[in-house]
Amino acid sequence: TISLEDYDGEIVVLNSWGQWCAPCRSEADDLQEVHSELQKRKIGTVLGINVRDYNPQVSNDFLEDNGLKYPSIYDPPFKTAAALGGVPTSVVPTTIVLDKQHRPATVFLRSITAKDVMDVVDKLEKE
């Protein structure tokens, strides 16, 4: 089980995705780039939330085929959204950048680039 408490004091980039989602596939490399940079700086992680893929093998294959090294939880009904409060379950991909206290700093209701996310991370790192 993965919990935000595992990343206490770190920036966490949450990304809801599905292997069936074309924008999710296009942003996968960018998210891996963000994760690598966060790990290199020792300031955080990307955490994927696999939604609406009801075959866990398909989602695992997506992670492996794309060389994604960041942790990803399997949550087809997207129950995580309820815990986050106010996150639309119908918009995939959604990327939420959480500050070091795990408060939402930015929400992207679209596909992202590494620059989109790192611009936010760079500001949060200075806080």
Describe the role of every protein-language-model region.
Residues 64-69, 75-126:
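Thiol/disulfide oxidoreductase modules built on the thioredoxin-like
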Residues 10, 23-24, 52, 56, ...:
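Solvent-exposed, acidic/flexible segments
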Residues 15-21:
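Aromatic-flanked redox-active Cys/Sec active sites in thiol-based oxidoreductases
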